[in-house]
Amino acid sequence: MKLIVFAGGTLGHICPAVEIIKQIKNKYSNVYIIFVATEKDKNYQIIKNCISDEIKFLECYSIKSSIKKNIKNIKAYQELKKLIKSKQITSAIGFGGYISGIGIKAAQSLKLKTFIHEQNSIMGLSNKLVLKKVDNIYLSFPITKYKKTTVVGNPVYFKAENLKKNIYKERNKMLFISGTLGSKEINQLAVNLIRGKHLTNYDVTIITGKKYYQDVFKLLKNTNTKIYEFSNNLIEQISSSEVVISRAGSSSLFEIIGTNTLSIIIPSPNVTNNHQYHNALYFKNVGCIEMIEENDLSINNFLSKLNILINNKEEYYKSMRNFKIDNLIDKMIEEICQ
C-alpha cells in the first residue's frame, strides 16, 4: 500500500500530518509514504525529522494569486499527477495549505481514495475545494454541516496528553507564543508587561518568530527574560509552563488543552473566515481558556484575565481534564490504509 500526504504553509497543517505519518509507520511499517509540502517549508525541523519514505517540496500558491503564480500551481498539479502515477499511489490525505488542495485534486483526477483532515472550527479554502469528492472528512471540531465526517480531534492533542505525564510543570513559568509567523501584538504585549514590571513573579519565556526576534531581544536584553526566535520542542515548552499566552491556531490550542496548561488566548483577526476566533470561542465556552480579542488587548485587560485565571485555576484544570475527544485516530489510520 502506498500513501501520499499533503500539508504545507504553516506548522498548524504540518504538525498533525507528521504525527499521523509517525503513527501510520508505527502501526503499518510496510506502508510506503510520500510527504509533500511547499518549497517554503523546507527549513522546518519537524519536516527534516519526518519518518516518511520520501519528502517532496513543490512551489505553489493561493488560487487567488496572480496569473504567473497560478501557472506554477498548474505545473505543481501536473507534477503531482506524474508522481502519483509513477509511484503507483493508492490513497491520499490532505491536511490543509495550498499544496493540499492541489494534491488532493490531482489524486481525485486519478480516481484514488482521498481524505482530508480539517484542524480548524471553520473549513479552510483548500479543503472546501475538494471535500465533495473525498471518501471521508476528519474533523478536529464538531462541524455539523458537512456529510461524510468523523470527529477525530487534532492528532497533536493525544501526543500532548501523553506528554504531560512525563514533564514537570514549573510554577510561575509564563510562555508567550504567537504562531508560525510570529505576532507583533503578542510580542509588544510581552515587552510592555516586562518593562512595566507587571510580571516580576513570573519566569518569562518569549518565542517571538523570526521577524520579531531582534526587536524584542534589543528591548529586553537587560532583563532575565528567555527569548527565542523559534522552538523545536514547543509542546514540551507548553507542558512545562504554568501559563501560556498564545494565538488560537488549532494545534496550539489542542497542545495547551492536552497538556492541561492555563492559558490566555488572543486570536489573530488576520486569518481566513476569522477561524481563530471560533477555535478559541469553542474552548472558552467549555471553560478551558480565557480569551482576549485583539481589539480589546491592553495591559489592564490582560492583568484582569490573568487574575481570573490564577484565582480560579482549579476550575480551569477541571474543565481541561473533563474535555474529552474519543480517540478515533486509529480508526482514521485503518480507513486510510485499507
Residue ranges of model-derived segments:
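C-terminal "capping" alpha-helix adjacent to the active site of nucleotide-linked donor transferases
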Residues: 286-314
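An amphipathic, basic-hydrophobic alpha-helix
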Residues: 64-91, 109
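Donor-nucleotide binding loops and adjacent catalytic segments primarily
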Residues: 35-36, 41-51, 161-243, 277-280, ...
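C-terminal alpha-helical cap of glycosyltransferases
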Residues: 308, 325-338
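A short, well-ordered alpha-helix in the C-terminal region of glycosyltransferases
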Residues: 314-326
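Acidic donor-binding loop of glycosyltransferase active sites
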Residues: 89-90, 239-254, 261-262
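Conserved nucleotide-sugar phosphate-binding/catalytic loop shared by glycosyltransferases and other
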Residues: 5-11, 26-72, 178, 292-295
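Active-site-proximal region of nucleotide-activated glycan assembly enzymes
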Residues: 2, 32, 108-163
